[in-house]
Amino acid sequence: PHARIIHIDIDPASIGKNVRVEIPIVGDASVVLEQLVSAIRGSADQPDAESLGKWWEQIKQWQSRDSLGFEMSTEVIKPQFVVQKLHEITGGDAFVTSDVGQHQMWAAQYYGFSNPRRWINSGGLGTMGFGLPAAIGVQLAHPEATVACVTGEASIMMCIQELSTCKQYDLPLKIVNLNNRYMGMVRQWQ
């Protein structure tokens, strides 16, 4: 709540869109970050070993917390639990695709990726319906691999017709539909 936020975005309309920003910077993030790094490296105000030690201690304290913990329910199956089970069942070796929404956040946080290039999603581009076509592409590229599309009921409806493609090419990909009966992320931000 007391964070001082610097928001770098190439699109001025996005600055401060979701949270209050203390320092807005319009520009290409890669260019701006290079400039900031150069400015910091050129500064005489460099942290000393003691300050860095304290910082690393703080980081270790944060890492020791179970910040992704959640309470199990006897009433419903929690989406976090589903994604953790997916990781357990696949041994963490699946290619996982996702669209945009709360299911994307849960997949990113709870799958526990340990292999490179296994998390296929559109990032912050807001592309509902990305997950299933991406899973089809990954399955075609890696026919022997386990491919799972973690999606939500609104996202999967953007491209549900692609199930016929899965049938046509006999693709064994898995679809994990985390149905919360809402466009959850839209509702969350409203």
Language-model features: locations:
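Generic enzyme active-site microenvironment
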Residues: 7, 97, 150-151
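Active-site diphosphate/adenylate-binding microenvironment
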Residues: 54-138
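Thiamine diphosphate
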Residues: 15-18, 24-26, 30-36, 106-190
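Glycine-rich, acidic loop regions that bind phosphate or pyrophosphate groups
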Residues: 1-54
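An acidic- and aromatic-residue-enriched active-site/binding cleft used to recognize and process polar
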Residues: 10, 101, 152-154
